[in-house]
């Protein structure tokens, strides 16, 4: 079981970031999804067995848990919701209820145990870049082209 609420814009941004590495088609259905882990905050991970992205977003977590949702379906649903707080709740069978304003959706998730473990990057080799730094690098790249 899992329950949290989060601003739609923050959630949509995190989904967009993590979805960049999700496999479009895979023999492993979980790889077409995003791993959602609710603890003190919400962590969303995308992985295609070669590249992975993990991003964290501020959320009001009522009940901790984790599950996998199809990235395309989840992203489309959140994108179509009104700009308000999204309330996410999942039961023990991974049935997810999403509500935001007048919009309500029910979708079936997958168990987090179906999701492959992302490799751990050692601190000696990791890179941490603030989002603003990435925006500047993107601008510089466009300027140089």
Task: Give a label for each model feature.
Residues 1-145:
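Structural preference for solvent-exposed beta-strand-turn elements
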């Amino acid at each position: 079981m899992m329950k949290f609420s989060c601003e739609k814009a923050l959630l949509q941004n995190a989904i967009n970031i993590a979805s960049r590495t999700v496999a479009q088609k895979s023999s492993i259905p979980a790889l077409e999804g995003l791993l959602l882990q609710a603890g003190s905050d919400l962590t969303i991970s995308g992985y295609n067995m070669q590249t992975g992205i993990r991003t964290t977003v501020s959320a009001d977590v009522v009940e901790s848990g984790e599950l996998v949702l199809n990235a395309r379906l989840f992203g489309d649903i959140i994108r179509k919701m009104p700009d308000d707080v999204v309330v996410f709740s999942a039961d023990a069978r991974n049935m997810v209820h999403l509500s935001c304003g007048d919009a309500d959706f029910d979708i079936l998730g997958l168990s987090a145990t179906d999701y492959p473990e992302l490799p751990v990057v050692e601190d000696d080799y990791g890179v941490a870049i603030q989002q603003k730094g990435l925006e500047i690098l993107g601008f510089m790249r466009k300027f140089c082209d």
